[in-house]
Regions:
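Glycine-rich, aromatic-flanked loop segments that form ligand/cofactor-binding clefts
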Residues: 19-36, 98-103, 107, 122, ...
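Alpha/beta catalytic cores of nucleotide-metabolism and tRNA/nucleoside-modifying enzymes
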Residues: 2, 8, 112, 116-117, ...
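Alpha/beta enzyme core
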Residues: 11, 15-16, 66-80, 84-94, ...
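Short, charged, surface-exposed secondary-structure boundary motifs
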Residues: 32-34, 166, 225-231
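Active-site beta-loop-alpha junctions enriched in small/polar residues
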Residues: 1, 27-29, 58-60, 85-87, ...
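Hydrophobic faces of well-ordered beta-strands that scaffold small-molecule active sites
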Residues: 22-24, 53-57, 80, 128-132, ...
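Short glycine-enriched, charge-decorated loop/helix-capping segments at active-site entrances
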Residues: 39, 95-101, 165
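Glycine-rich, positively charged N-terminal anion/phosphate-binding segment
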Residues: 1-74
Length: 318
C-alpha cells in the first residue's frame, strides 16, 4: 500500500508479529531499472527483520521489467510481484496495473520478461507473482484469471472486486473460489491467494477454507490491529507478547506510535513528507479515554517535533 507499507511500518509490524511474507509498496520499473546509477528506490529499502520480502513493481515496458527483475534477483529479495490490480484511475487509464486487464497481450509480455530476468547471477530463480482484480467494469474471471494462470506464474493473488469498485461493496469470494478451480485445471502448481476485506488471521483462514485458496494477503486490515499477525502464534525472539491491539493499554499504544514517529523521522530525513505520518495516528489512538482528542491534536501538527511535544504534554492514561 502506497505510503503505508514502507520499511518503517514493516519494522513496526514485525516487532508486533510478522506475517509469513511482506510486500513492498509498489515501485515503478523505471525507478528499479535506474539502480545503481540513481541508488536504491526508497520503496525498496529494508532491514533483516522485514524478510522474507517481495518487491512489487508496476509499469508497461517489458524491457524495463526484464532489467528490474535482474536487479531485484541479485539484491536478496524473496520474490517479484507484478501489480495488475491497482484501481487508481489515472494509473489505470495509462494502461498500467488494473489497466492491463484490458491489455492481455502486453500483460503476457510483461510476465515473460519478468520471469526471464528473475534469475540471480548464481542461478537462483525468484518466484514471480501477479496481484490483480476480477475485471475492470465487470467480472471476467474465466477469461482474465484463466489467461494469467496459463503464463507460468508462481502465485496469483486475486482481489475479489473490479477496478471500478475500488474498495466499495463486498468482496466477491466466489470469484476467488472460481480462480482456484481454474488453477486446478490450468496450472496445478500455481498458488492462489485471496485478497479483500480480510482483517484478521482468523478471517484469512476462513476465506481460505471457503475458497480453497492457498493463502491470504492482508492490506487495509492492518489498520485495525498492528498485532493481527501474532494472533494464534507463540511469541518469537524479539517479538511482543501475543495480545491483540485492543488489549494494549493506552500507554502501550502511545509508546508504539511514538516509536513509529521516531523511526519515520530518522529513516526518511525529510525525503518523505511528515503529512504521511498522519494516516497512521488512527491506528494507534483508539480504545481509551482521550484517544480522539489526542488524534485531533496530532492531525493539526506540522512536523515530527510538534507531534512529539503534543504527545509529551498529553495526559495519557496508564
Amino acid at each position: 500500500m502506497e505510503n503505508v507499507t514502507d520499511t518503517v511500518f514493516r519494522r513496526i509490524v514485525a516487532t508486533c508479529g510478522s506475517p509469513d511474507v511482506f510486500f513492498t509498496e509498489f515501485t515503478r520499473v523505471e525507478q528499479v531499472a535506474a539502480f545503481p546509477r540513481r541508488g536504491l528506490p526508497g520503496r525498496m529499502r529494508s532491514t533483516d527483520i522485514e524478510r522474507p520480502l517481495v518487491v512489487q513493481i508496476w509499469g508497461t515496458s517489458p524491457e524495463l521489467y526484464l532489467r528490474s527483475a535482474r536487479i531485484i534477483a541479485d539484491l536478496g529479495f524473496a520474490g517479484i510481484d507484478i501489480n495488475m490490480g491497482c484501481p487508481v484511475r489515472k494509473i489505470r487509464n495509462k494502461g498500467s496495473c488494473s489497466g492491463l486487464i484490458a491489455r492481455p497481450a502486453l500483460a503476457a509480455e510483461i510476465i515473460a520478461a519478468t520471469r526471464e530476468g528473475a534469475v540471480s547471477t548464481d542461478g537462483q530463480h525468484l518466484p514471480v507473482s501477479v496481484k490483480t482484480r476480477i475485471g475492470i467494469e465487470r467480472p471476467v474471471v474465466d477469461e482474465w484469471l484463466g489467461f494469467l494462470l496459463a503464463q507460468g506464474i508462481d502465485v496469483l493473488t486475486v482481489h475479489g472486486r473490479t477496478a471500478l469498485q475500488e474498495s466499495e461493496g463486498p468482496c466477491d469470494y466466489d470469484t476467488i473460489a472460481r480462480a482456484v478451480q481454474l488453477r486446478n485445471n490450468i496450472a496445478p502448481d500455481t498458488l492462489v491467494f485471496a485478497n479483500g476485506d480480510i482483517r484478521t488471521r482468523a478471517e484469512g483462514s476462513a476465506v481460505c477454507t471457503q475458497t480453497g485458496c492457498d493463502g491470504a494477503m492482508i492490506g487495509r486490515g492492518i489498520f485495525s490491529d498492528p498485532y493481527l499477525f501474532a494472533a494464534g502464534r507463540s511469541p518469537q525472539d524479539g517479538q511482543e507478547p501475543n495480545r491483540s491491539f485492543s488489549e494494549q493499554s493506552a500507554a502501550e499504544k502511545v509508546a508504539l506510535m511514538t516509536r513509529h514517529i521516531h523511526l519515520h523521522r530518522d529513516e526518511w530525513k525529510g525525503t518523505r513528507n511528515y503529512e504521511v505520518m498522519k494516516r497512521f495516528y488512527k491506528i494507534y489512538l483508539v480504545g481509551f479515554p482521550g484517544a480522539e482528542e489526542l488524534r485531533d491534536r496530532l492531525n493539526h501538527t506540522y512536523d515530527y517535533e510538534h507531534a512529539l511535544r503534543e504527545i509529551a504534554d498529553f495526559p495519557v492514561p496508564g
